[in-house]
Amino acid sequence: MELLKSLEHSRAIQENVNIKPQWLAGFIEAEGHFHGKAGQQPHFSISQHPADFKLMESISKYFDHGKVRLSVRPDGRSEAVYTIYSKDVLENKIIPLCSENFISTNKSLQFREWTKAHFPNYQSIALPDPNKKIDPNWLVGFVDGDGSFYSLIHKTKDYKIGYQVQTVFDIAQLDSERGLLTRIGDQFFGSTQTWAKSKDTQHLRIMSKNGLVNYVEPFFDENKLLTRKEYDFLLWKEMLKTIKNKEHTTLSGLEKIKELRDLQNFYRSNISSDIQKLIDKKLNK
């Protein structure tokens, strides 16, 4: 019952969210795109799963410009898209926000080149200071975009039930952003991170009980996620609680964690009825 209350409270927060500039900068560094080469029309966009439609509307209200539209991709999947073409809004709102709050080297380089190509008044934007402390709100926005909360279940002979359960917090970035991930791990998570690599991607992972219980859980309890990822976190906390109580070493505890993983999948794709109607309308055009 307490978990359901938390999930419903999280839904209400998303629909009445107060966007902070540092959060938005972190979210843009994870999910934003700067379009248009020199000589082309510049524009900026963010796209998200339709479940985050209300949050995207809050972003459009923050910039006091434009509307969020639903788009259906060639593969049939729908997404909520917010695009800014207005050069005035780009120059007077997007550029100041990003130049003052960006942290990521890769996105900052893209943003810098895009700005130099289209806006004569912004020819000397400095790259972020690698020694500057990261704002917690920036990290929340970045994790709302590129972070993950999940559990791993491995077959093993080391446990009586035949399975080992691990809860994981993960942020994935290109190889070139390992320095940024190290800064995040050292500043916020007590240097408890481990590393994993897949193709050209680095994964900062917190898997130790110390790191999860003493750093990750309290940080995101205090600094709320704004996307549907908050549901992932709340359900992940229940998995972590099961492990803290050593219930995961029993078959009933293992089943509980599997049920919580299924709930995560449900809440990731659960869309309010009004948004579903808009998607259906799009698909039936």
Where are these regions (language model features)?
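Internal intein/HINT superfamily modules and their associated LAGLIDADG
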Residues: 1-285
